[in-house]
């Protein structure tokens, strides 16, 4: 397991016990264990509202560009085109721990480099951790606009703690590897 006291993305100090940067939401601790990957990929129903994670989900090269400075970090992003093809006909809400000052450039880059059209997006406005931040946006924006019927939603989310938060609301939340093939490195 690798621990950081300095965030590799924003270079802010974090205590050794933090799993995610308090400033930008970057994952700080990576387990060396292999994640369980479904052999038979799941379908994504077209009637679902997709609650989409940005880093480590839509972005395919988050780890290699984690040290890049803005705006280069945005310009160097590559996307999971197999995932994009599976969700491009859904209503997609991007909810990310990325800082709000990156929103306009990030959305422009996604639009210019994929067939995905983000219907709504919600960003980190401070030092919020991903699960707390995404729960905030879920309760403040998503549920008031779209209702709180969990069967309407599917969250595609890299962060296990955030998937657990969605589960509190009975929203199915899965990592991208349940839907697409893992790239061989």
Tell where the protein language model's regions lie, with residue ranges.
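Conserved Lys-Pro-Asp/Glu-containing loop-to-beta segment of HAD-superfamily phosphomonoesterases
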Residues: 133-161, 166
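Non-catalytic pre-domain segments flanking phosphatase-related domains
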Residues: 4-11, 22-24, 31-52
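A short, structured active-site edge motif that brings together acidic residues
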Residues: 113-136
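Acidic di-acidic motifs
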Residues: 16, 53-55, 156-158
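Short, non-ligating residues that shape and space the ligands of small metal-coordination modules
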Residues: 16-17, 30-31
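Short, acidic loop-to-helix structural element flanking the phosphoryl-transfer center
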Residues: 45, 65-93, 100-104, 128-139
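Flanking scaffold residues of small Cys/His-coordinated metal-binding clusters
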Residues: 2, 15-16
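Asp-based phosphoryl-transfer active-site loop
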Residues: 47-63
């Amino acid at each position: 397991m690798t621990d950081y006291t300095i965030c590799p993305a924003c270079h802010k100090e974090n205590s050794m016990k933090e799993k995610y940067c308090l400033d930008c939401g970057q994952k700080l601790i990576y387990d060396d264990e292999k994640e369980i990957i479904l052999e038979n990929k799941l379908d994504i129903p077209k009637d679902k509202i997709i609650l989409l994670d940005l880093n480590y989900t839509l972005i395919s090269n988050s780890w290699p560009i984690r040290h890049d400075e803005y705006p280069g970090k945005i310009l160097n992003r590559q996307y999971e085109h197999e995932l994009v093809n599976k969700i491009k006909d859904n209503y997609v809400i991007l909810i990310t721990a990325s800082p709000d000052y990156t929103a306009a450039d990030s959305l422009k880059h996604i639009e210019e480099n994929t067939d995905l059209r983000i219907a709504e997006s919600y960003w980190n406005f401070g030092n919020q951790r991903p699960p707390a931040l995404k729960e905030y946006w879920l309760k403040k924006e998503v549920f008031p606009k779209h209702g709180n019927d969990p069967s309407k939603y599917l969250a595609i989310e890299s962060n296990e703690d955030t998937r657990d938060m969605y589960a509190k609301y009975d929203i199915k939340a899965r990592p991208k590897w349940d839907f697409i093939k893992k790239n061989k490195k």
